[in-house]
Amino acid sequence: GSSALGFWNEFIDFDKKHVELIGVEAKYAAPLSTNAKVAILHGAAQYCLTDKEGQIAETHSLSAGLDYPGSSPLHGLLKDSGRARYTNASDKEALAAFKLITKLEDIRPSLEPAHAWSECIRLAPKLKKSDVIVVNNCGKGYKDKKIYIEQLGYYPK
């Protein structure tokens, strides 16, 4: 959320044809990439996951930073205006991205950017070789070391 907004600040005024902003949410905490409705959460109108009764829904993600039913109102504005698009990645996809990026680039992303790396891996084969992808690798994986060990059985040195 806020990390992406800060990162996008330098790119937001570029023409959408030249710079696409893609936000990646956790699959089971994804109000912007699903059919979530606008609701009030913590005093702000925002896209929010709700249950059948309109109450705030439960979410799940291995990533504590993405395990949240709402979204920044600014992300909602970017979605509604078409300036940004949002997708999501499952825990399994984020873990697979962590493994690949660690192996190929010797980068150990935290769980939050591992979701973004997952989208990068999905998107890259569809692009021209001259296209550039910039990923906000905003956190070190060491903070999620325990989760990586529980899920993968190891944490790379």
Predicted regions and their residues:
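Gly/Ser/Thr-rich helix-start
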Residues: S2-S3, F7, V24, L66, ...
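Anionic group-transfer/hydrolysis microenvironments
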Residues: K27, A114, C138
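Short, flexible coil/turn micro-motifs enriched in small/turn-prone residues
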Residues: G1, L49, I101, V134-N136
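Short glycine/serine/threonine-rich phosphate/pyrophosphate-binding segments
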Residues: G1-W8, P31-L32, P113-C120, Y142-K145
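Active-site/ligand-binding loops adjacent to catalytic centers
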Residues: D13-H18, G23-I107, L111, E150-K157
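Flexible, glycine/charged-enriched surface loops at secondary-structure junctions
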Residues: I107-A116, S130-V132
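Short glycine/serine- and small hydrophobic-enriched flexible loop segments
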Residues: N9-I12, L100, S118-P125
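Catalytic phosphate/nucleotide-handling subdomain of diverse soluble enzymes
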Residues: K16-V24, E119-K157
